[in-house]
UniProtKB/Swiss-Prot annotation:
Cofactor requirements of the protein: FMNH2
UniProt-listed InterPro entries: Chorismate_synth, Chorismate_synth_AroC_sf, Chorismate_synthase_CS
GO BP annotation list: amino acid biosynthetic process; aromatic amino acid family biosynthetic process; chorismate biosynthetic process
Protein name: Chorismate synthase
Keyword terms: Amino-acid biosynthesis, Aromatic amino acid biosynthesis, FAD, Flavoprotein, FMN, Lyase, NADP
TM region(s), chain numbering: none
Pathway: Metabolic intermediate biosynthesis; chorismate biosynthesis; chorismate from D-erythrose 4-phosphate and phosphoenolpyruvate: step 7/7
Keyword flag Flavoprotein: yes
Protein residues bound to NADP(+): R48, R54
Organism ancestry: Bacteria, Pseudomonadati, Pseudomonadota, Gammaproteobacteria, Enterobacterales
Length: 361
């Protein structure tokens, strides 16, 4: 299986399956001399891990990360950092009934068409359980970006179903189970989730991630544009079906006079572009949004076929999220951090000596 690595200078390679013994990753390109402990990674893992809310899957995994290599006496050595998280709460018997059945809306059918077999236990490699290692690797990037460049990366839920959420108060995001920045909408989200659990159904969501303090100049035209790499990283997250940078698809209804971000001596007067122009960061906030589909792991009966081509009725068993968008927030933050870390190292490698007199804000 190819496609398990992201990045060029800051490279993250993950391995493991949902019901395997463990998940792991190798992180290459981490500069030496960075203070790093398992506790530095655990905070974001705790934000992502299952079983922490009545609105997410009740699979209870502690997700305790172990640093296996690349750190000596609490400091990175510049060599490959190996990370491992053991799986402790697998219930593979929940999936025995789908050994020969393809769950509609899942990767069962396509994995078997591609490889001729599949690990049917919780989706195997296609499960969102894999993203735990992305979050661990992303936490390394977030720490480096914050300490060396003052870059802050934050994410939040900005829509669930037909309930739009305004970014009113970032401090509220960690104070509720929805990563919601709009305290006036938490009750409505709660009611929607209770209704979905009662119906055995699910709902889609929109997640927004913002990076502040990113310097101008990151991005490698033409094929490794910063926005292209961000879109690639976010689209690689399970259930993501669309990505927008800045105003995204809303620009369709705008005129050029409205959409352009005018510049004065005081700086940019707007940020419709989401902090990226010509594939290169402008120094403004980088803003990206991603749309996540409603999970197909629901108890509402649906039609499908088995591997023998026979039509059968499917009712999903097991422990699942009514809205996968909730736990996607720390994953989106991690993927944005990984991309920015990679591009900062690439910029430093090629253009460290470049100096300009152009104003920066």
């Amino acid at each position: 299986m190819a496609g398990n690595t992201i990045g060029q200078l800051f490279r993250v390679t993950t391995f493991g399956e949902s019901h395997g013994l463990a998940l792991g990753c190798i992180v290459d390109g981490v500069p030496p001399g960075i203070s790093l402990t398992e506790a530095d990674l655990q905070h974001d893992l705790d934000r992502r891990r299952p079983g922490t809310s009545r609105y997410t899957t009740q699979r209870r995994e502690p997700d305790q990360v172990k640093i296996l290599s690349g750190v000596f006496e609490g400091v990175t050595t510049g060599t490959s950092i190996g990370l491992l998280i053991e799986n402790t709460d697998q219930r593979s018997q929940d999936y025995s009934a789908i050994k020969d059945v393809f769950r509609p809306g899942h990767a069962d059918y396509t994995y078997e068409q591609k490889y001729g077999l599949r690990d049917y236990r919780g989706g195997g490699r296609s499960s969102a359980r894999e993203t735990a290692m992305r979050v661990a690797a992303g936490a390394i990037a977030k720490k480096y970006l914050a300490e060396k460049f003052g870059i802050e990366i934050r994410g939040c839920l900005t829509q669930m179903g037909d309930i739009p959420l305004e970014i009113k108060d970032w401090s509220q995001v960690e104070q509720n189970p929805f990563f919601c920045p709009d305290p006036d909408k938490i009750e409505a989200l709660d009611e929607l989730m209770r209704a979905l659990k009662k119906e055995g159904d699910s709902i889609g969501a929109k997640v927004t991630v913002v990076a502040s303090g990113v310097p101008a100049g990151l991005g490698e035209p033409v094929f490794d544009r910063l926005d292209a790499d961000i879109a690639h990283a976010l689209m690689s997250i399970n259930a993501v079906k669309g990505v927008e940078i800045g105003d995204g698809f809303d620009v369709v209804a705008l005129r050029g006079s409205q959409n352009r971000d005018e510049i004065t001596k005081d700086g940019f007067q707007s940020n419709h572009a989401g902090g990226i122009l010509g594939g290169i960061s402008s120094g403004q906030q980088i803003i990206a949004h991603m749309a996540l589909k409603p999970t197909s792991s629901i108890t509402v009966p649906g039609r499908t076929i088995n591997r023998f081509g026979e039509e059968v009725e499917m009712i999903t068993k097991g422990r699942h999220d009514p809205c996968v968008g909730i736990r996607a927030v720390p994953i989106a933050e991690a993927m944005l951090a990984i991309v920015l870390m990679d591009h900062l190292l690439r910029q430093r490698a090629q253009n460290a000596d470049v100096k300009t007199d152009i104003p920066r804000w």
